């Protein structure tokens, strides 16, 4: 298999990104798909595009996708409480999401104190080397959800992870999600106002988590997600 990654920006500001793992015969289709995504994104025009292809040499770990749970009455406060994330930590996470700094990866916070535990500053932790092998989905919205579930599954597949909060930085996409090993993948509608680039990915963990091992798992271990 091959890993293919796309990153696009304008004046060093992130515009669009995507990645997957695929067989050789599918590379051309993904290259075209990611090229078109980069040059036709709602976040604006780009002046830089990076497409990177690497052969996957390490053993691939199989993960079962988090179940999708739809409940229009879900609130972030309730979900955080059910997963052991303090209200203070949740609010600290929302501060990162709503500030004007563009983080290119996830931020790891203590689920108890809200203290930032990673030391990657603006870069953040990048979840890479992943692909959704089988997905019961159709349509444009489901394609977006498929990619989000793949990321959420990887992020929540490690001991010590309590939950993850994600808000898209796309201008007109206002649906975020809250995911956890305990509650599955929960979409949160109208999580932000339209027309803003505010967004981000916050991972809430126990302070005793093996942080270096976790970051290595997210960034370097090949991961294939399947439906149960």
Swiss-Prot record:
GO terms for biological process: biotin biosynthetic process. Its cofactor is Mg(2+). Its EC number is 6.2.1.14. The keyword Cell membrane does not apply. It is an enzyme of class 6 (ligase). It catalyses: heptanedioate + ATP + CoA = 6-carboxyhexanoyl-CoA + AMP + diphosphate. Keywords: ATP-binding, Biotin biosynthesis, Ligase, Magnesium, Nucleotide-binding. Homodimer. This is 6-carboxyhexanoate--CoA ligase. It comes from Staphylococcus epidermidis (strain ATCC 12228 / FDA PCI 1200).
């Amino acid at each position: 298999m091959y890993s293919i990654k796309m990153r696009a920006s304008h004046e060093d500001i992130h515009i669009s990104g995507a990645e997957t793992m695929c067989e050789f015969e599918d590379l051309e289709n993904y290259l075209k798909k990611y090229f078109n995504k980069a040059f036709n994104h709602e976040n604006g025009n780009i002046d830089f595009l990076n497409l990177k292809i690497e052969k996957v040499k390490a053993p691939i770990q199989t993960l079962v996708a988090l179940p999708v749970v739809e409940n229009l009455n879900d609130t972030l406060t309730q979900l955080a409480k059910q997963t052991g994330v303090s209200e203070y930590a949740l609010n600290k996470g929302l501060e990162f999401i709503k500030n004007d700094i563009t983080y290119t990866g996830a931020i790891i916070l203590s689920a108890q104190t809200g203290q930032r535990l990673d030391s990657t500053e603006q870069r953040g932790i990048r979840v890479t080397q992943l692909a959704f092998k089988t997905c019961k989905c159709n349509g444009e919205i489901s394609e977006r959800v498929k990619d989000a579930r793949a990321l959420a599954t990887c992020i929540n597949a490690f001991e010590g992870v309590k939950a993850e909060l994600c808000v898209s930085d796309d201008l007109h996409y206002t649906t975020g999600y809250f995911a956890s090993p305990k509650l599955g993948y929960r979409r949160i509608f109208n999580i932000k106002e339209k027309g803003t680039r505010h967004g981000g990915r916050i991972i809430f963990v126990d302070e005793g988590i093996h942080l270096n091992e976790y970051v290595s798992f997210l960034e370097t271990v090949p991961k294939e997600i399947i439906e149960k």
